[in-house]
Curated annotation (Swiss-Prot):
SMART domains: RRM. It comes from Candida albicans (strain SC5314 / ATCC MYA-2876) (Yeast). The modification Phosphoserine is found at residue 78. Keywords: Cytoplasm, Initiation factor, Phosphoprotein, Protein biosynthesis, RNA-binding. Coiled coil: none annotated. Component of the eukaryotic translation initiation factor 3 (eIF-3) complex. Residues 152-163 have a biased composition (Low complexity). Residues 197-276 form the RRM domain. This is Eukaryotic translation initiation factor 3 subunit G. Transmembrane segments: none annotated. RNA-binding component of the eukaryotic translation initiation factor 3 (eIF-3) complex, which is involved in protein synthesis of a specialized repertoire of mRNAs and, together with other initiation factors, stimulates binding of mRNA and methionyl-tRNAi to the 40S ribosome. The eIF-3 complex specifically targets and initiates translation of a subset of mRNAs involved in cell proliferation. This subunit can bind 18S rRNA. PROSITE patterns: RRM. GO terms for molecular function: RNA binding; translation initiation factor activity.
Amino acid sequence: MSTGLLDSWADAGDEFSAPPEVIANPDGTKTVITFRTNQDGKKVKITQKIKEVKVQEKVHPLIAQRKNWKKYGKEKNSPPGPDTSTTQLGEKVDLKLGTSWKQDEKKEEEDKAHERAQKIAVQTIKCRVCGGDHYTAKCPFKDTLGAAAGVTPSGTTPEPTSEGGAGAAGAGKYVPRHLRADANGNVPTREARDDSTTLKVSQLNSFVDEDMLRNELFAKFGPLQRVTIVRNRETGESRGFAYVSFATEEIAQRALDTFNGKGYHSLILHLEWSKKKKT
């Protein structure tokens, strides 16, 4: 006859060795009943109701056929699915379904154009007193920093006392390179620049740049001293005309006779001397 202690061991062994009780319900579900001992040493009955759900995925027949293809080469014994060490995955593309995709694309382009316009406006507007992105006349520091920057309280630059191209232009205006003073403060005169070999090319398309003029039109006339397209200072877009300087007046005359009145990118070119000839 076994003792009470041995009976409890036997009961514990029967508890853990007994399989769970499974009951089939009329609605297709299953009830699983198990017994176990919790942390307090008490015997607990656990009842679980399980419902089996069959999920069927519909794919294209060709896709299902490709999934059954056998791998070969280095991937012969690899499990199903791509391996990133031997397979390069393409970029994930989000498919937007709907009828308003054209309007959405147009709105995105308008937003990008608005952002570019704001960036250009911020870059082109610069205060001469504090360097901020606002006009000098509206600077909040012009009363305190204006004297150091040479700006009057009204927002204007006082007239310089020295004469010449660089002095008359003022501190906030652009001075062309050929009119800037040298190290000794000497400003070149207008007569020092020779424009006798320079042609003015008008009626240019907006997308034409210096390289197009040089390579497509005037390169065959020999080396060019200067090719400059006049652009808008704020937007950077072409204003439709340019200046081209040649080695000699004879070469410039040949270029004028060749291209004046000829078509170039849907427009008729007009060539003339940048400086009128003396008769």
